[in-house]
């Protein structure tokens, strides 16, 4: 995924089908400078991670 699309998803009210290593996730925030995203596991919102945006996949 690219940074612009990740930002669109994070700012949208709609829920997108995004995954990280096969795990459904929600994007909280995108840092354009570092090209990373703060995500959390859709099934376990307390599990937060910061990952490279390019590692996210939209299904």
UniProtKB/Swiss-Prot annotation:
Domain of life: Bacteria
Coiled-coil intervals: none
Single GO biological process annotation from the record: sporulation resulting in formation of a cellular spore
Cellular compartments annotated: Spore core
Keyword Cytoplasm on entry: no
Keyword vocabulary terms for this entry: Sporulation
Family: Belongs to the SspH family.
Family matches, as HAMAP family: SspH
Protein name: Small, acid-soluble spore protein H 2
Organism: Bacillus cytotoxicus (strain DSM 22905 / CIP 110041 / 391-98 / NVH 391-98)
């Amino acid at each position: 995924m690219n940074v612009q699309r990740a930002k669109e998803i994070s700012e949208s009210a709609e829920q997108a089908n995004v995954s990280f290593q096969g795990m459904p996730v929600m994007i909280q925030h995108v840092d354009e400078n570092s090209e990373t995203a703060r995500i959390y596991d859709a099934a376990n919102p307390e599990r937060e991670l910061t990952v490279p945006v390019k590692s996210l996949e939209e299904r």
